UniProtKB/Swiss-Prot annotation:
<feature type="modified residue" description="Phosphothreonine">
    <location>
        <position position="202"/>
    </location>
</feature>
<keyword id="KW-0653">Protein transport</keyword>
<keyword id="KW-0007">Acetylation</keyword>
<feature type="modified residue" description="Phosphoserine">
    <location>
        <position position="226"/>
    </location>
</feature>
<feature type="short sequence motif" description="SHP-box">
    <location>
        <begin position="241"/>
        <end position="248"/>
    </location>
</feature>
<dbReference type="GO" id="GO:0005783">
    <property type="term" value="C:endoplasmic reticulum"/>
</dbReference>
<dbReference type="InterPro" id="IPR035952">
    <property type="entry name" value="Rhomboid-like_sf"/>
</dbReference>
<feature type="modified residue" description="Phosphoserine">
    <location>
        <position position="201"/>
    </location>
</feature>
<feature type="transmembrane region" description="Helical; Name=3">
    <location>
        <begin position="95"/>
        <end position="115"/>
    </location>
</feature>
<dbReference type="GO" id="GO:0036513">
    <property type="term" value="C:Derlin-1 retrotranslocation complex"/>
</dbReference>
<comment type="function">
    <text>Functional component of endoplasmic reticulum-associated degradation (ERAD) for misfolded lumenal proteins. Forms homotetramers which encircle a large channel traversing the endoplasmic reticulum (ER) membrane. This allows the retrotranslocation of misfolded proteins from the ER into the cytosol where they are ubiquitinated and degraded by the proteasome. The channel has a lateral gate within the membrane which provides direct access to membrane proteins with no need to reenter the ER lumen first. May mediate the interaction between VCP and the misfolded protein.</text>
</comment>
<feature type="transmembrane region" description="Helical; Name=1">
    <location>
        <begin position="16"/>
        <end position="31"/>
    </location>
</feature>
<dbReference type="InterPro" id="IPR007599">
    <property type="entry name" value="DER1"/>
</dbReference>
<keyword id="KW-0945">Host-virus interaction</keyword>
<dbReference type="GO" id="GO:0042288">
    <property type="term" value="F:MHC class I protein binding"/>
</dbReference>
<keyword id="KW-0812">Transmembrane</keyword>
<dbReference type="GO" id="GO:0036503">
    <property type="term" value="P:ERAD pathway"/>
</dbReference>
């Protein structure tokens, strides 16, 4: 048990709370402590009955059962793996910026969920984070199951197909990828590569609550440290090398 506790405490803070909630809320529903009917995102209940908790619970809840358990565990792994890599990599020392990314993606997904009657938001939010990681490491070669190897930029689409095969919904994964693309475009691509204005900015109260842990300028439109280092190493060119690939499942 101490090993599990040490592992859990080693997870970066924001990912740790997200991971814990994604385990706890389905468990509460599975044990019947709270009826799962109160955990879904139902537009009518949220908009007209003022059940304002539903967008939050729908982000963490997943109906775990014999037919969905494997899909849940796979996406829980994706949450742990890629949120940890983003929080300790591109957003290392900048928890406010990372939390703002999650909030921006979450708000976009909630709005889409209300418009499209999507009752579960766990997978879209996880996929949006995975998409951002894949774009920031787009030229990295990753290994998927059965020894397949490809660039990281294709990983979100491979996982979309993989989740569909094991029982997921293409819509959930697609919405997550599109939201992740919107964030990546507004944060990095448009202001940095196309010379456009910054449309996103982390609120100052988040910096006061979660101050950056190292020097430098924080905020959107500023490349993460990993991108700056890669750009310096490549002479400022457009093609980056962000490290070595890894096998999916390796810690």
């Amino acid at each position: 048990m101490s090993d599990i506790g040490d592992w859990f405490r080693s997870i970066p803070a924001i990912t740790r709370y997200w991971f814990a909630a994604t385990v706890a809320v389905p468990l509460v529903g599975k044990l019947g402590l709270i009826s799962p009917a109160y955990l879904f995102l139902w537009p009518e209940a949220f908009l007209y009955r003022f059940q304002i908790w539903r967008p939050i619970t729908a982000t963490f809840y997943f109906p775990v059962g014999p037919g969905t358990g494997f899909l849940y565990l796979v996406n829980l792994y994706f949450l742990y793996q890629y949120s940890t890599r983003l929080e300790t990599g591109a957003f290392d020392g900048r928890p406010a910026d990372y939390l703002f990314m999650l909030l921006f993606n979450w708000i976009c997904i909630v709005i889409t969920g209300l418009a499209m009657d999507m009752q579960l938001l766990m997978i879209p939010l996880i996929m949006s984070v995975l998409y951002v990681w894949a774009q920031l490491n787009r030229d990295m070669i990753v290994s998927f199951w059965f020894g397949t190897r490809f660039k990281a930029c294709y990983l979100p689409w491979v996982i979309l197909g993989f989740n569909y095969i094991i029982g997921g919904s293409v819509i959930n994964e697609l919405i997550g990828n599109l939201v992740g693309h919107l964030y990546f475009f507004l944060m990095f691509r448009y202001p940095m590569d196309l010379g456009g204005r910054n449309f996103l900015s982390t609120p100052q109260f988040l910096y006061r609550w979660l101050p950056s842990r190292r020097g430098g300028v924080s905020g959107f439109g500023v490349p993460p440290a990993s991108m700056r280092r890669a750009a310096d190493q490549n002479g400022g060119g457009g093609r980056h090398n962000w490290g070595q690939g890894f096998r999916l499942g390796d810690q």
